[in-house]
Curated annotation (Swiss-Prot):
Protein name, as recorded: DNA-directed RNA polymerase subunit beta'
InterPro entries: DNA-dir_RpoC_beta_prime (IPR045867), DNA-dir_RpoC_beta_prime_bact (IPR012754), RNA_pol_asu (IPR000722), RNA_pol_N (IPR006592), RNA_pol_Rpb1_1 (IPR007080), RNA_pol_Rpb1_3 (IPR007066), RNA_pol_Rpb1_3_sf (IPR042102), RNA_pol_Rpb1_4 (IPR007083)
Protein species of origin: Mycoplasma mycoides subsp. mycoides SC (strain CCUG 32753 / NCTC 10114 / PG1)
Family recorded in the similarity comment: Belongs to the RNA polymerase beta' chain family.
Cofactor, free-text remark: Binds 1 Mg(2+) ion per subunit. Binds 2 Zn(2+) ions per subunit.
Gene Ontology cellular-component annotations: DNA-directed RNA polymerase complex
Top-level taxonomy: Bacteria, Bacillati, Mycoplasmatota, Mollicutes, Mycoplasmataceae
Amino acid sequence: MENLNRKKAIKIELANPDTIRSWSHGEVLKPETINYKTLKAEKDGLFDERIFGPTKNYECVCGRYKKANPMNKGKKCEKCGVELTESIVRRERMGHIELEEPVTHIWMLKVAPYRIAAILDLKAKELEEVVYFVSHIVLEQGNQKHFVEKEVLDLGSSRITKTREKLQLTILDVIDLINDPNHRDTKKANRLLEELKNTAVPFSIDEATSLISKYTGAKFGIGARAVEYLLEKVDLTKEIEAIKIQLENSKKTPNERTKLLKRLETFDSLKRSKQRPEWMVMRVIPVIPPDIRPIIQLDGGRFTTSEINDLYRRIIIRNERLKKVKEMGAPSIIVNNEKRMLQEAVDALFDNERKPKPVQRKNKRPLKSLTSVLKGKQGRFRQNLLGKRVDYSARSVIAIGPDLKMYQAGLPREMAITLFKPFVIQWLQDHEYAENVKIAEKMLLQNDPKVWEALEQVIKDRPVLLNRAPTLHRLGIQAFEPKLVKGKAIRLHPLVTTAFNADFDGDQMAVHVPITKEAVAESRALMLGSSAILGPKDGKAIVTPGQDIILGNYYLTTEEKNAKGQGMIFSSLDEAFMAYDSGQIHLNSLIGIALSALPEQKFSDKNQRLNSYLLTTVGKLYFNQIFDDNFPWINSNNIWNAKEAVKEFIYYFSQDINNVIENIQVQQPIKKKELSLIIERYFETHGARKTAEMLDKMKDLGFSFSTKSGTTISAGDVVAFTHKYDEFKEADQKVEQITDFYNMGMLTNSEKKRRIIEVWSDVKDKIQDELATVLRKDVKNPIFVMVDSGARGNISNFTQLVGMRGLMNDTKGDIKEIPIKSSFREGLTVSEYFVSTHGARKGMADIALKTADSGYLTRRLVDVSQEIVVVNEDCEPSKGFEVSAIIDTKHDNVIVPLKDRLVGRFTFEDIYDDDKNLVAFANTLIDKNIAEKIIMSGISSVVIRSVLTCDNKRGVCQKCYGLNLATASVVNIGEPVGVIAAQSIGEPGTQLTMRNFHTGGVAGNVDITQGLPRIKELLDVTTPKGAVAIISEVDGVVSEIEDYNGVFVINIVTENEEVKKYKTEFNSVLRVEQGSSVVAGQKLTEGAIDLHQLLEFGGIQDVQNYILKEVQKVYRLQGIEISDKYIEIIIKQMLNKVKITDGGDSDLLPGEVITIQNYKEVVQDCIVKSIRPPLSKAQIFGIKKAPLESSSWLSSASFQDTARVLTRAIIKGKEDKLEGLKENIMLGNLIPAGTGLTGTQEVEQLAEQYHNNEY
């Protein structure tokens, strides 16, 4: 059913005085708020009940209507005039203030691009001087020739002499016009002339201008009234025509053209939106409803009030004072001063912070004006509209819940009873334990046993949502079925901690209760903890077991020769388990089990079943119990080919088991990597729910056997290692030699440093290798077990424990040349400890900075891509996107192999190998097998479907997007892929380094920024720091390279025999040599490319490929895998606008920025009508700028630059069609994604199905 409350669009415009009066319920005349004795609102004041409505429902202010009676609705009290209605109207009824003098709106005057100045073609500074009563302006030229219309008479600066001269000349003309030396005005004119000639003598400008006006018809003005007069005279149509003629004049400089285009945009916007420029000057200002700016009584009888009330009071007081001053007939200087103060008071109300001297409180803090209420993190948009507080939520510390199933979370009983209170009360009433709500509440207070029964029943039907801040990706909120637990901590399943990035060292989590039927169904069908097996950023399992679970399964699958019970053969699983339970065999003993006792689906060869046994251990029997019968038997760490690998462990009964054991090598246990592979493979064959069930069994096994393994760690496990001192001796000699060379001047400082660092790095590597060998000999050493299994720690930690700590970083992040020779076991000396503090401290500071930086990056990414949603199945695009392996050309190593780029995408066209054999049809989903086939065929590049070439007007289609990595199936219609892309790029942001990796000044290498700063540089499209590459503007051949002492000049000859010269910076590293052929956009020197240049010379496709390659390079270097498609979505948003260079015969204006889709529509329309189509130029916007260019003004205003975005939207009279997610959230609509787009029917059926099954 269509939601009738759903708002379709929202429009913003300038309000004209009549509109403001029509909104108003009365004029506010007095600055009073409430009476200090009666605490009632003052009549005609800022809280007057006659204007804004009653403070209590259906009660008037005088007491005549005391009892709240809804029957009186709509009546007015005969005595005090208050309308009897609900008090809620005080949140919506507005008042107004009639201003004694017009004032300009500060946004239109002072927010760049200064709109009023643009309309009047004045400098913003001059216009401000007019508005604030510093300078006069010419309103009408009359029949004098010295002053032109709109000229500003500047009396405050160096231009005063010029103004004096012009006034003298004009007054001389006036004397000629009077033509009577004895006339009173002639004498006045002569006196003025004398005053004007002597620059030290002051003169009255008012006197001079009134005299000139009297005889020449010229008009002068000052203040907002003058501005209003000029704006009223503006004829929008004539102005537009005039500017178009000026633009055709080719002699204009680029700056002049830009200024003209800005003016043209303003005039055109006003004309199209049917608004008048004079509305930018206000004669009436609205007073917002009183409940939005309340006055609140504090304890002790004092009051606190919203600061907006103070700003309104100042306006009313000054307005009244201006009235009085006028009535008294005060001199113009006093009147003008009052007018200026009124203008400033209105400015303070609208945007106090923009004023040079904001109105301050006693504590020197500026008062919060209407603009400050809107903008920033604490503003209306971000604080109240995009994120709201909810009614049913709880928060507590989390603790591990090892006995929970993957779909469960433990809720403390007290927390649950409070959260589910309304449902418990309902249940008690339905089951007739309580007659009404009051009795039920009493039962709750008294802890009646029935209450707990009710709670147990209620929670069966309602999952809860658990959230851990910061919510960096969609798995930061998951749904669980609640299970009541004792204590006050929320219990969390150990395997979901990775997704939440939670640990149990005091982390807290929030609980939310889905209330409506649809919300409950969505939680169950889409968000249950047991369905979140894969991480969205790379499609790899995110629920990988860690620590004790790995340790337990490692111990379980270890094989040991000569252990108790070795060589026994069992006829059934139960027999083997009984033998283990009774202590006859060791868990890791090599034993045989009859093949007939095991499920036959697990083995490929059926014939051997009756006369063979499998060589294994009891541990592996337990381990294989957790998989179902269709999953191959795991007997070694060959997981991908397990069914074949198991064959080598099958022997005939005729072969003596003890001989067999003697002649074989023990198998490696199952480690962390193998467990991950098992989970991925299980997910592929069994789906999410079955995998969750298997994981729970794996967890139980892991915990159980890590306990039984009795792994401990003590100083005795840390082997002593004395061999290192020989290495140190040798290294010290080398260092001494290097220092001698340096002292003799044979090495530079940086070379010395580099060589010393190399010496110590080699020593540490040597010690590490030797230690690894020593450690491997003792297979049962608990430290080795932990490192080898992947449960905790690595060999480098062990090296620091017993070998040496090695080289440390200094505060800049560079490596120090003093090594730490001690290990932790020996203990560090004081100086060594001091050396190691720098790096550690920098690490902590970096993490804090990085978290904030990475969070802000995510916010900007979400803002740029939030409107992208999957809207249909196939857009049938005209072109595809060619991909090949991403290779770092400098070091010639593969960054992203082709296979990774193909899996999960659709082909665009049929793919053939070199022998013209068909490998894959067009529009086929490429899975691992097809990708493997493509690679084996020797194909190096493939044209695939991509979001970059998707032809949808809004959003993308299923085939251009491909697989949803979180579910490993084709993406659903309604999936908000833009937000997921932003989260997938932003979430690993905290793992990126803050460091710009510099090469420490080593010759021949170019400094390249990396880590988070490089990502920001690419996505914000800023000029790269460090070396900027020179790129070729033309196709051609390098004819010669001239070398002028390290500065090169590269000559490129084009096909037309033109020579293009490029001069490099000193000591640049060249990427071309003589005879190289180059294409436009190709690098000639090392360094980062400026994206604006690349777009201009190379084109859109080059930019797309470059950003994709560079972003992948940064993430892959840190070992983070991110799917191409996410980066493509962001690139699509950065490049989806064009700038009109020539409007042709369309309605588009030069300089206008529109989306490529809209541009294509206009062009097609022009072709159909046979008129000249517009011309355009591709644009690239960084992720800071792109959201501000969004078609939705609500979304842009809530991002950044609120005042500027709103001003622009107002001038255009923009209508927001509510197509993105943010704008719908703000208006309380369902978002146009997921079930908000497709309806909840399917999800409700799914939820019903899941509710009946366990997982």
